[in-house]
Amino acid sequence: MKKTELLYEGKAKKIWKTDDENILIAEFKDSLTAFDAQKKSEEAGKGALNCKISANLFKLLEEQGIKTHFVECISENEMVIKKAEMIMIEVVVRNIATGSLTKRLGIPDGTKLPFALVEFYYKNDALHDPLINDEHALILELVDHESELEELKRLGREINVVLKSFFDKANLNLVDFKVEFGKDSEGNIILADEISPDSCRFWDKTSGEKLDKDLFRHDLGNVKVAYEEVLKRITKVMQ
């Protein structure tokens, strides 16, 4: 498998074309960004940690019947993935109120929600990824049919059930997470991008300690140490 051309570079990853038109390579970067990339830093080894964490969680979800773009890891920070036409919607699933939800609705921080809340955000850097509803998504033609929005919600909730149960065994509360989806060569919606402490909030169930990118956002502690702890707990549960 050879990289042939840089297809896309985002805040956290580079996506490379390969000599197989249906296969790409995702290279996880060591960069850290927050607040629409107004805050930036580098953390050596962070890309490798996110690659390993994402690979483990993709495998877990595949075992539970949720299709993903994951094929295999080929280095510490490189993952072979199936090519997918990305849907420009970020699907956010919330179990505990924190972050923007508390600011928008005045729900006290740390409130357990009565059910998993699924939100859509328009993936658009220039507009700062605004919160949208189903009608917005249809008007913007982000999906072909309303049924695809229902599929995104269903998949978001299914992923939440699997991950919540898994992280419970790791003594972590899955507070919320962001996932992205794409369509494979046959038009099936599959989970893409990554699942890592960059895109999830994890709170220790005993101490309440944050083990995710909020440490960087709010200068609360060492990101690499936290990500290493998340990987350690994931590995232990999967053994």
Curated annotation (Swiss-Prot):
GO terms for biological process: 'de novo' IMP biosynthetic process; cobalamin biosynthetic process. Keywords: ATP-binding, Ligase, Nucleotide-binding, Purine biosynthesis. Belongs to the SAICAR synthetase family. The keyword Magnesium does not apply. Its EC number is 6.3.2.6. GO terms for molecular function: ATP binding; phosphoribosylaminoimidazolesuccinocarboxamide synthase activity. It is an enzyme of class 6 (ligase). This is Phosphoribosylaminoimidazole-succinocarboxamide synthase. It comes from the Bacteria. The keyword Nucleotide-binding applies. It catalyses: 5-amino-1-(5-phospho-D-ribosyl)imidazole-4-carboxylate + L-aspartate + ATP = (2S)-2-[5-amino-1-(5-phospho-beta-D-ribosyl)imidazole-4-carboxamido]succinate + ADP + phosphate + 2 H(+). It comes from Nitratiruptor sp. (strain SB155-2). CDD domains: SAICAR_synt_PurC. Pathway: Purine metabolism; IMP biosynthesis via de novo pathway; 5-amino-1-(5-phospho-D-ribosyl)imidazole-4-carboxamide from 5-amino-1-(5-phospho-D-ribosyl)imidazole-4-carboxylate: step 1/2. InterPro entries: SAICAR_synt/ADE2_N, SAICAR_synt_PurC, SAICAR_synth, SAICAR_synthetase.
